[in-house]
């Protein structure tokens, strides 16, 4: 049995949250970063007359042991740090020195602009060039 580490952020949602909850509840891994998006209800959008639309939920997921539903709340990490610092926190916790951790983070760290729906740019991690 080996513990594994999962990095998460407020952009982790939907199926990723199912995975996060399983990791957390099984005790097989450790979650680092920010609380996830809280997006676990699923359904579809319907266009209505006069420019209106609605979302029709057709299902929800929940923790079968506790009946807990994380819609709108998200799955909290075991170690709460800003998402940009999650890898550094994992490396520190497994005994990697600060200088080596910074080098590793620089090698696999990345930025890739994305946009929030209706909002401004957001910086998320992406592979470093080269």
Each predicted region: which residue ranges?
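C-terminal "post-core" interaction segments
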Residues: 1-130
